[in-house]
């Protein structure tokens, strides 16, 4: 998108989906969502998103969703890393959040010899610890959802660990590069041959929506499996 002075921001794309692209009502585009829900979509942040944007405090619902998303992603990535063998439990032993979760698992179940079950219960305990901490640390007088200082530190250490040992692992980077190539191939093909796009997208182009925006919207809605299959389809035409 850079050559066309465009960029992809998942918050903005979420807004486009719920306000413009979804067509389930006869008299207007988008979904019938409240202002608070749409505001939450735009204010959802990660350390990599919207670096130059500064928002007023999001609604409580949006704050809860934002931190719940972080809990889910971090712990799911730990589970993925362990399942794939790219990280090990021994590596995680230095993380206080893993130590605390392991201790609780031992207190509850004793020694678990099955590593698959032990991993599942420990990741589940990490999720439980973070959720319980959010509940206890959120101060209604400040109207703010947050971790306590201790678990905020644990969470940062967990994210740093994932960045150092999982996100930039050679196998993960190779998969990421492959995904980028698939997206680039799709974009280039559609841009050169718009007739390869679905008929509804071709219709959008005919009504004046820029081709690059239509392609962006279409690719953004693809699953990994569909994107791979679609590249195979259009390159064989």
Enumerate the predicted regions with their spans.
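Histidine-centered, transition-metal-coordinating active-site segments
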Residues: 7, 11-13, 17-237
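Short helix/strand-bridging catalytic loops that position acidic/His residues to coordinate divalent metals
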Residues: 1-5
């Amino acid at each position: 998108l850079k050559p066309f002075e465009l960029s992809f921001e998942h918050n903005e794309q979420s807004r486009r989906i719920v306000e413009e692209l979804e067509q389930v009502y006869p008299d207007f585009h988008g979904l019938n969502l409240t202002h608070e829900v749409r505001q939450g979509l735009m204010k959802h942040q990660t350390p990599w998103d919207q670096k130059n944007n500064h928002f007023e405090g999001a609604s409580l619902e949006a704050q809860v969703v934002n931190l719940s998303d972080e809990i889910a992603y971090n712990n799911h990535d730990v589970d993925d890393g362990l399942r794939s063998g790219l990280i090990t439990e021994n590596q995680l032993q230095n993380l206080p959040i893993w130590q605390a979760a392991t201790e609780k698992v031992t207190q509850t179940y004793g020694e678990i010899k099955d590593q698959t079950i032990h991993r599942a219960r420990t990741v589940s305990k990490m999720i439980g610890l973070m959720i319980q901490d959010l509940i206890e640390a959120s101060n209604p007088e400040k109207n703010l959802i947050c971790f306590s200082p201790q678990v905020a530190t644990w969470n940062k250490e967990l994210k740093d660990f994932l960045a150092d040992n999982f996100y930039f692992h050679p196998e993960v980077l190779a998969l990421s590069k492959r995904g980028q190539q698939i997206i680039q191939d799709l974009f280039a093909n559609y841009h050169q041959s718009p007739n390869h796009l679905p008929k509804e997208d071709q219709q959008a182009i005919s009504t004046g929506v820029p081709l690059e925006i239509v392609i962006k919207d279409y690719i953004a809605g693809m699953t990994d499996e569909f994107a791979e299959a679609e590249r195979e389809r259009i390159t064989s035409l």
